[in-house]
């Protein structure tokens, strides 16, 4: 990915892919494996959490990998002006589409928040990216068939990519098929493997990195690999965000929108 100036908010009529993640000073982004006793690795401050939810309102879809969906069970919704308050969930027409890259359809969909929220019409139905060889097994595998049935029961769909293990990140996430379905603006929130695959792609348009003033042990946390493939040296800006700092190639309009939201909730 070559770093160039990205304009905010992104146009609704053209492809725009954002990579965004939060990391500690020593580059840790989450726990290696799910740990009920530890919970989710808490990184972002209240202020940067607001920034993330502001971003979500400007995108058609939010993409995560299957490991993030399993470990964190995110709702992938937008809540403003206070993301921590369930009553601040925005109307359905302002919600992004959850996109989960689950190549093997291995997730327990009955337990996922995105399924429950879609059923309750509080969130949009999800799109699930699936490998073609797995899709061919659906009619003969009761567990796979049940997963597809559950996804479809809430209005969700499976998007079948062209190859099982493509080299290209864009092919891996079926970017062309997402665009064909009107999902032009895509916000990729993780996890580490999905982000690492994206760093060499020419289809990435923007990045927003939240760096938090914390240090975590390397023994039970993970980092993002292949960061050297992401050119962060030009056309980038540093912005304060509470105790955190934001590193991005978005234009100043991005930070101005964020500051407006902090002082005026009507800016949503």
From Swiss-Prot:
PANTHER family hit by this protein: 2,5-DIAMINO-6-RIBOSYLAMINO-4(3H)-PYRIMIDINONE 5'-PHOSPHATE REDUCTASE, DIHYDROFOLATE REDUCTASE FAMILY PROTEIN (AFU_ORTHOLOGUE AFUA_8G06820)
EC number: 1.1.1.302
Quaternary structure (record): Homodimer.
Pathway the protein contributes to: Cofactor biosynthesis; riboflavin biosynthesis
Similarity comment: family membership: Belongs to the HTP reductase family.
Keyword Transferase: no
Function: Catalyzes an early step in riboflavin biosynthesis, the NADPH-dependent reduction of the ribose side chain of 2,5-diamino-6-ribosylamino-4(3H)-pyrimidinone 5'-phosphate, yielding 2,5-diamino-6-ribitylamino-4(3H)-pyrimidinone 5'-phosphate.
UniProt-recorded name of the protein: 2,5-diamino-6-ribosylamino-4(3H)-pyrimidinone 5'-phosphate reductase
One Gene Ontology cellular component: cytosol
Pfam families: RibD_C
Highest taxon above the source species: Eukaryota
Catalytic reaction(s) noted: 2,5-diamino-6-(1-D-ribitylamino)pyrimidin-4(3H)-one 5'-phosphate + NADP(+) = 2,5-diamino-6-(1-D-ribosylamino)pyrimidin-4(3H)-one 5'-phosphate + NADPH + H(+); 2,5-diamino-6-(1-D-ribitylamino)pyrimidin-4(3H)-one 5'-phosphate + NAD(+) = 2,5-diamino-6-(1-D-ribosylamino)pyrimidin-4(3H)-one 5'-phosphate + NADH + H(+)
Keyword hit for Transmembrane helix: no
Enzyme class name: oxidoreductase
Family matches, as InterPro entries: DHFR-like_dom_sf, RibDG_C, Riboflavin_Biosynth_HTPR
GO molecular function term, any single one: 5-amino-6-(5-phosphoribosylamino)uracil reductase activity
Lineage of source species: Eukaryota, Fungi, Dikarya, Ascomycota, Taphrinomycotina
Organism: Schizosaccharomyces pombe (strain 972 / ATCC 24843)
Protein residues bound to NADP(+): 68, 72, 103-106, 191-195
Keywords in alphabetical order: NADP, Oxidoreductase, Riboflavin biosynthesis
Single GO biological process annotation from the record: riboflavin biosynthetic process
